[in-house]
């Protein structure tokens, strides 16, 4: 519910051309509907909300938006609802000036498959920004319908900043996903920092190479915010204590197994479970240290 409320509020705040849907009660009703269904329903309702605001600008804008949204839906509906969260969060991250947090978070939580939904989210945000910036021309009667469509088409296809951002998002998602799934210690933290640095470097040098106007301070602050948010996600989602890592091995009739066990940070050492694997009987015996301690105290008493 909260995510849907934020999404619909941000869309109304960014566009807000149709007064009938630019209303807190409409946002609340749509948010309640989304609370009962999957994230895909929220995505479809958000697209319909965008389409309604575009219709208030002009029929040409609404038609162009409908074609663009259908193409995006064909892409992102092929993925799971968890991956499609990236499509919803990307426009929000731009309005909050922390776009780097989306590819970093998607890379550690969902993997490389979320690169496509996040890229679609980038295109969706820049299209809404285009409609907002060119609303005066698009609403004017002196501009021909074909000129309006050409304006929208050029604003999407020739937007170098948008395509640079799409490439950066895809690169960061893939890099973070690969590093975070490695077996070495602190893989998530290294992936988060690496992803933020890659975002900053590609955005800065890409902007210089493509002559795109960007704010250096905003890019750096977005990268720093991505690191902070990534560490928070790592603490709640992974939360392991690498200082207590244990390496062990066991074998059966066919294989020798080398196991690296990293305990959760919130699990105290006295409550951990020790599993002993027997190769002959292939029986797993679980011995809990706290129960052994209690048995010893009972016998002593």
Model-found features: residue ranges?
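Hydrophobic transmembrane alpha-helices
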Residues: 1-47, 53-54, 63
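Membrane-interface helix-loop-helix junctions at boundaries between adjacent transmembrane segments
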Residues: 32, 45-118
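Juxtamembrane/interface segments at transmembrane-helix termini
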Residues: 135, 181-185, 212-216, 232-251
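Generic multipass alpha-helical transmembrane bundles of integral membrane proteins
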Residues: 92-224
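Short, charged juxtamembrane terminal tails flanking transmembrane helices
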Residues: 290-301
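Transmembrane alpha-helical segments of multi-pass membrane transport proteins and ion-pumping complexes
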Residues: 1-5, 9-13, 35, 39, ...
């Amino acid at each position: 519910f909260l995510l849907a409320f934020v999404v619909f509020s941000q869309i109304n705040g960014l566009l807000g051309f149709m007064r009938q849907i630019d209303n807190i009660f409409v946002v609340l009703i749509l948010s309640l509907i989304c609370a009962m269904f999957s994230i895909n329903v929220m995505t479809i309702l958000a697209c319909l909300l965008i389409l309604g605001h575009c219709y208030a600008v002009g029929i040409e804008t609404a038609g162009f938006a409908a074609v663009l949204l259908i193409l995006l839906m064909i892409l992102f509906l092929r993925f799971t609802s968890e991956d499609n969260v990236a499509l919803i969060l990307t426009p929000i991250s731009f309005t909050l000036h922390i776009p780097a947090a989306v590819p970093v978070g998607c890379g550690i939580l969902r993997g490389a498959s979320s690169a496509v939904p996040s890229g679609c989210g980038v295109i969706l945000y820049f299209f809404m920004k285009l409609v907002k910036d060119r609303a005066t021309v698009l609403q004017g009667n002196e501009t021909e319908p074909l000129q309006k469509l050409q304006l929208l088409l050029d604003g999407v296809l020739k937007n170098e900043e948008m395509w640079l951002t799409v490439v950066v998002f895809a690169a960061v998602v893939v890099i973070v996903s690969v590093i975070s799934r490695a077996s070495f210690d602190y893989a998530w933290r290294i992936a988060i920092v690496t992803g933020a640095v890659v975002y900053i470097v590609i955005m800065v040098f890409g902007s210089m190479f493509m002559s795109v106007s960007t704010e250096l301070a905003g890019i750096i602050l977005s990268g720093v915010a991505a690191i902070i948010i990534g560490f928070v996600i790592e603490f709640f989602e992974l939360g392991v204590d690498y200082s207590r890592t244990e390496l062990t091995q066991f074998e059966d009739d066919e294989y020798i197994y080398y196991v690296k066990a990293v305990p959760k940070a919130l699990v105290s050492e006295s409550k951990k479970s020790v599993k002993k694997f027997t190769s002959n009987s292939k029986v797993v015996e679980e011995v809990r240290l706290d129960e052994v301690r209690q048995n010893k105290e009972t016998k002593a008493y």
